[in-house]
């Protein structure tokens, strides 16, 4: 068995990043927090099975997702209701960065977090792996 236990994100504002994460994923909570050896705050935001470690950095990087520079392009999260997530995020002041075109087996929306990292949220409309994994519409 293998599963992703956590991810670690560097953030210029731990509070702002925590708000973004818990707005997008309301079941997540602050599991633990403290100060690193330099006295900067860090947090584990998640549930009993998975968390995102949020570490403080002093400046935002200049890498942009999909910019032909190596690095992470986006995090993809499966959700039950993309429309509800989108409403919740917009009501909290976040802007949709990309709303993917309609697909018969899925709905997707994307948001940038406060430090410019891209987050994808996908709702599958089918349990059939062939339909879920059909990317014939990808450009």
Language-model regions, residue ranges each:
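Hydrophobic side chains in well-ordered alpha-helices
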Residues: 17-20, 85-89
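N-terminal beta-strand motif that seeds the catalytic metal site of vicinal oxygen chelate
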Residues: 1-18, 73-75, 127-139
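Vicinal oxygen chelate
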Residues: 4-12, 31, 43-46, 63-139, ...
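Acetyl-CoA-dependent GNAT
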Residues: 56-60, 124
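Core segments of cupin and vicinal oxygen chelate
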Residues: 8-51
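Conserved beta-strand in the GNAT
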Residues: 53-55, 120
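A short, acidic/glycine-rich surface segment
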Residues: 30, 40, 59-64, 129-131
């Amino acid at each position: 068995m293998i599963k992703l236990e956590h991810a670690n994100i560097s953030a210029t504002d731990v509070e702002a990043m925590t708000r973004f994460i818990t707005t997008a994923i309301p079941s997540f909570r602050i599991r633990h927090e403290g100060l690193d050896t330099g006295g900067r705050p860090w947090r584990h935001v998640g549930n009993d099975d998975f968390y995102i470690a949020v570490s403080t950095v002093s400046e935002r990087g200049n890498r942009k997702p999909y910019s032909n520079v190596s690095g992470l392009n986006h995090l993809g999260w499966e959700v039950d209701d993309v429309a509800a997530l989108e409403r919740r995020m917009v009501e909290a002041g976040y802007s949709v960065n990309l709303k993917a075109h309609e697909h018969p087996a899925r709905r997707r929306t994307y948001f940038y977090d406060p430090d410019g990292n891209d987050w994808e949220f996908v709702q599958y409309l089918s349990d059939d792996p062939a339909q879920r994994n059909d990317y014939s519409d990808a450009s």
